[in-house]
Amino acid sequence: YPKSKNIIKNVNRDIFRFVNHKPEISSIIDAIAHPFAAGNFYYFIHYSTHAEFSFVSDSIKNVLGYNKEDFTPGFLAKILHPDDKNQFGDKELISLSFLKKQISVNDISSYKLAFLLRMKHANGKYITLLHQARPIRVSEAGEILETIYVHTDISYLNVSVDNRVSLISKNNHSQISIDATKNQLLPPNCFMKNFSSR
């Protein structure tokens, strides 16, 4: 059973590495995923040991109006709504803490976290995004090494951003909602820490 989970983890990792080097595959993934998405979306991949994102999908132009080459961790921090900056870090901290303390190492990559945030579009207006993140590579010690993030524009739903973060497991069909109201220091593997002080 653990061996099959490692195979699945490696397949996930290899798919995203392949997409990173084959833009036409990225287009196919976008075409398949789009009908099932709640709105227009883009995705990006981050290695916890690197300062920059390793991949950003072309569809960011349709969602936020920016070129993918301009979308860096520092730029993401710059276009976050001022009221959401602390919440973003708090929500990520709570999620990472939950995964490290409550979930076995083999199950970490089966969870995704989801919450709402606002980002400034190139036209100057803020849009509401559903932020989803899923670890795609985890060390034997349980450190998250690589994560895929998906941002979906849900502005048309007229929802308000709150302190809630949801953790959803694909294996046991469970969902946990947490109120992320504590303001704590971010752990070193949280990419928000790397650019929140810039």
Model-assigned labels for residue ranges:
Residues 1-19:
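Short, low-complexity N-terminal regulatory "tails/caps" that precede and couple sensory modules
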Residues 2-3, 132-147, 155-161:
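Short loop/turn elements at sensory-signaling interfaces that couple input to output
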Residues 20-75, 169-185:
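PAS-family sensory domain signal
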Residues 76-100:
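PAS/GAF/H-NOX family sensory domains and closely associated sensor/linker modules
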Residues 99, 103-133:
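Per-ARNT-Sim (PAS) sensory domains and their PAS-associated C-terminal
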Residues 150:
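Sensory beta-strand/linker motifs that couple input domains to effectors
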Residues 154-176:
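Histidine/lysine/aspartate-rich catalytic loop segments that bind and position anionic ligands
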Residues 178-198:
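Helix-turn-helix DNA-binding segment
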